[in-house]
Amino acid sequence: MHYSKLKDFPQNFLWGASTSAYQVEGAIDEDGKSPSIIDMYEHPSDVADFSVASDHYHRYKEDIALFAEMGLKAYRFSIAWTRILPNGTGKVNEKGIEFYNNVIDECSKYNIEPVVTMYHFDLPYCLEEKGGWLNRDTIEAFVEYAKVLFIHYGSKVKYWLTINEQNTMILHPGAIGLPKGGKLPSKKDLYQQNHHMMLAQAKVMKLFHNMVPEGKIGPALNLTAMYPATCNPNDAIAAHNWEVLRCWNFVDVCAFGKYHPLAWSYLKDRNIAPEIQDGDFETLKGANPDFIAMNYYSTATIAASKGDASDVAARAGDQQIMLGEQGVYRPSENPYVEKTQYGWVVDSVGFRYTLRKVYERYQLPILITENGIGANDTLEPDGCIHDQYRIDFIQKHLHQMRLAITDGVKMLGYCPWAAIDVVSTHQGYKKRYGFIYVDRDEFNLKELKRYKKDSFYWYKQVIEENGKNI
């Protein structure tokens, strides 16, 4: 749809950027922090691990001052469960409480709205040894952890995210790392874990609304629209299959308190449906998220299944993520979109399409919590980083977001990935996302000096203008 005039971004729009604890903080064994599953996973030997990362733990004041200089109105970061409750439950680590209090207070000092992710892939390893999310005890452990956060930070933090990319953890478990020994859970076990996460999330949202009545809370999922490869009706059915299984079922359980009927039929047919205990379906009802947080990177194009093993293939550029499932869907190429050097589809129009679908389905405000392009940035001798490709990527996505706002989609804010360079899970510091360059490579920490990229100055101007020239 074309418009004679585009709507402006809201005056209170949360222009921000994002990080996660394990990718930015470092200090993995300092001040009482215990190991998380991320710390204990088998890590590629040729890329940086998370032990130092970008050393945000020791440099948060410097970093947040830079975020303020860039003009950020919001900073989305995650809290490491292992810093707060090193044993998963029980005794609270006061050093951990103090650190995040300091981060939040530093944000407030610059009028930056903290947006807190409670769980970003990094389950305490001590809980994993007891079965992790497959163990129903982890549900109550998460509720206990959440209560500690709400007690200490509920009066300071308005916007909360429960679980980051639950759908990625369930559908592509190898994407966040391999357990020691390299064996991934079965599909049935993964969907049992998913059910327990859903229960934990519902309980925490209800607790939040009781303890922090003025706050806002939502799930943070990786959402994307699916295109059928052709106008063949079977391709359209396959695209809908994957859209439901990858996206809508995860949001439906949170927003509507029940499984999507197509997803439940799929789970039952394949004998991978979770075991349901008395009261589970009642627990899922009434979570009442206040908004949907959405991570968006690319779209997918889907063809009808051929019903054999050829339906499954590795996603281009990422061997950790398999696409396609026998009898459900198969991936297809889209000749109308570009790809990054890592094989990720670049589709800004698909961003608008996805926003329209999400808002139409759930009628809740949307907060973008990740969106960005990973690239091999180069630090020039004069200290400049010319990342025009990042400016182009974000500019196009912001324009499509403005079109979506004009379409009637209610947007809370935009927190792209990432505020500062972080450790990419599989490519280390070869693949960078930040507006701020961290001068280190895979194994040479150098001085970890910060440099402002060209995109830093560009985004600063966008924020100053409230996106009026996008």
Residues covered by each model-derived region:
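Active-site region of glycoside hydrolase catalytic domains
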Residues: 2-44, 87-88, 97-470
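Active-site-adjacent substrate/metal-binding segments within catalytic domains
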Residues: 25-100
